[in-house]
Amino acid sequence: MKRKKTVLQQILSEKRKKVKEGDSMSGKDEFGTTKYVIYAEFEANGVVERPDVVGAIFGQTEGLLGDDLDLRELQKTGRIGRIRVEVHNKAGKTYGTITVPSSLDRVETAVLAAALETIDRVGPAEARIKVLRIEDVRATKRKYIIERAKEILETLMEQEIPETQEITEEVKKAVRAKELIEYGPEKLPAGPHVPFSDSIIVVEGRADVLNLLKHGIKNAIAVEGTSIPETIIKLSKERIVTAFTDGDRGGELILKELLQVADVDYVARAPEGKEVEELTKKEIVKALRSKVPAEQVINEMFNKGRSFYELIRERESEGERQPRQVTKPEPEVVKAQPKAETPEEKREPATVVRPSAEKIVKPIETSKSAPELEEFREFIERVKKDGIALLLDENKNVIAEIPVRELTNQLKERKDVYAVVFNGVITQRLIDTVSESGVKYIVGARKYNVVRRPVSLKIITFAE
């Protein structure tokens, strides 16, 4: 009896091991639409084989339960599945297990299980069959579903769910990368506004352009290396250029090379020790607002050997003192002007009170602009109404009426223009163009970022 129990336990433990390794689901697939599974064990007092056991099951139950529960008929119609038998021989006896899948209802399955226990002979040997249990396959499936669902949920919980900010940042990053263009023969990384913008910002690398794009600045272009590309040199002759470099040694070297080979108008730098690609929007805006005219930087760096940041600190300290110096003497100059001073006399004190280069130019323009503005008043009213640009000869006769957008191209082709009147913004680029054409007067609505002009050219704005 002990031997029998040991063998049966060995068989059952092997089956449980297979179930744990995943055979339970493969068994489920084999059973198909099975609802129940009958598990039984048997013992035969002799050596028998698997076909002997199967034959005894079919032979000794035939006609026992009637035609409706005949095993052969049930198997043909698929209401019971393939009967599985495992046998083990030991000490002249045979032990084993029987598995019968059933698609019958629970009552019919129980009757069929009881019928198996009526088998008392297998082959030539006496035998005894005992039903261990009837398993509800659907319950097993439900258990499997629960366990598998736990595993899937744990896997899902382990995955990091991105936050809303990360998602939006990814989308913005993709859009910025799409906005990035390649400019010139060298295919330099640039913002989408570089091809047509009057002013550009020259930075060091692709990452700098992307960071500026991130904060809405779309007119940046990168030099991509320490050697300044020919495209940058060419652009510097046509546009207003601001060099915006990193606040390290590399940024200083690139800045020096830019100032030597390109026509740079302004210089801005990232805070000391920082790179343009890592700046916040606030830091970028502050750096660009603190830009310094290139002529001043060249003088300080190359002639005096001072650093850019020393110049910035000096400008900031002067800026704190400057309002007290400018606001007080100005009323005295205004009061003294109408009484006894001639226009020539008025210009001299103005140059003393206003020391910066830009402020020296303004009194010169103001002293003559009022009468000259009246000379062009008729043309100003006309361009305000019609939205065109007028090209005048020396006798103030209109020699051409053109759209404002064609003004630059026309001035490059013509050499007989004495004055230009248009309802638009006077930029550094336009001034450079008209100076090459020999124009003496340029009259516009206002001026923007004008840092240099020829001595022979007079600029008049509508507000003067």
Swiss-Prot record:
Its EC number is 2.7.7.101. Residues 315-351 are annotated as: Disordered. GO terms for molecular function: DNA-directed RNA polymerase activity; metal ion binding; poly(A) binding. It is an enzyme of class 2 (transferase). Keywords: DNA replication, DNA-directed RNA polymerase, Exosome, Magnesium, Metal-binding, Nucleotidyltransferase, Primosome, Transcription, Transferase. GO terms for biological process: DNA replication, synthesis of primer. Mg(2+) 2 binds at D246, D248. Its cofactor is Mg(2+). Binds two Mg(2+) per subunit. One of its GO terms (cellular component) is exosome (RNase complex). Residues 198-272 form the Toprim domain. It catalyses: ssDNA + n NTP = ssDNA/pppN(pN)n-1 hybrid + (n-1) diphosphate. Mg(2+) 1 binds at E204, D246. CDD domains: TOPRIM_primases. Residues 315-333 have a biased composition (Basic and acidic residues). It comes from the Archaea. Belongs to the archaeal DnaG primase family. RNA polymerase that catalyzes the synthesis of short RNA molecules used as primers for DNA polymerase during DNA replication. Also part of the exosome, which is a complex involved in RNA degradation. Acts as a poly(A)-binding protein that enhances the interaction between heteromeric, adenine-rich transcripts and the exosome. NCBIfam families: PRK04031.1-1. Forms a ternary complex with MCM helicase and DNA. Component of the archaeal exosome complex. This is DNA primase DnaG.
